[in-house]
Amino acid sequence: MSILQARNVHYIYQSKYQKVHAVKGINFAFEEGKFYAIVGKSGCGKTTFLSILAGLDLPTEGEIIYDGKSTAERNRDKYRLRAISLICQSYNLFPLLTVEENVLYPMLLRKAENAKQIAEEKLHAVGLDETYFKRLPAMLSGGEQQRVAIARALASDAKIILADEPTGNLDTENSEIVIDLLQKLAHEEGYCVIVVTHDLAIADKADEVLRLRDGYIV
């Protein structure tokens, strides 16, 4: 059963000179326990589509259905906080917070119980032990920072993980670690993992690949 659906989703925005039809009639159902890759050339609409799935933008036409209800009918802030976890290429860690504090942050926003214990569990789940907890992000490698970002996503308690070019700043070794971790989260932990990528290694490991061209699935 699908946890997230795109139904006839279009997105049009006004550029400096003209209207741009970035996403054109996308229909797709995403399921828990699966690892998806969205691929295509730059400008094909894949990041725009991910932004719509994340609730950062509303579709011009059509709708996104989460757990049986349109996101247009939901509180967008609560949807983004509780339903979706977003992982970016640039990690987006707070530079003055420790590793542990970065993972704690989304739980403090929703006043979660046992937040410290959960943060430690999620850090262990991504392969970071206690020796990392009090470090600042600047003390970590790119791959380690991305693992902290994934741990923070897990701490949000959402079942959908959206990732925009999560291996874009990583070397081959760290890219493989992150890809394997995201795949494991889908197959062993039951998350719905959706990744926008140019990385063919991610596409090769995905359960399903959505190829976009000029805003369409092809």
What do these predicted ranges mean?
Residues I161-D164:
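Catalytic Walker B motif of ABC-type/P-loop ATPase nucleotide-binding domains
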Residues N114-T131:
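Conserved ABC ATPase "signature" region
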Residues S70-S85:
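ABC ATPase NBD coupling module
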Residues L136-L140, E144-Q146:
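Conserved ABC ATPase signature
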Residues A54:
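Helix-to-loop junction immediately C-terminal to a conserved catalytic motif
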Residues G62-T71:
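Conserved ABC transporter NBD signature motif
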Residues L97-L104:
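Short coil-to-helix segment of the ABC ATPase nucleotide-binding domain corresponding to the Q-loop/switch region
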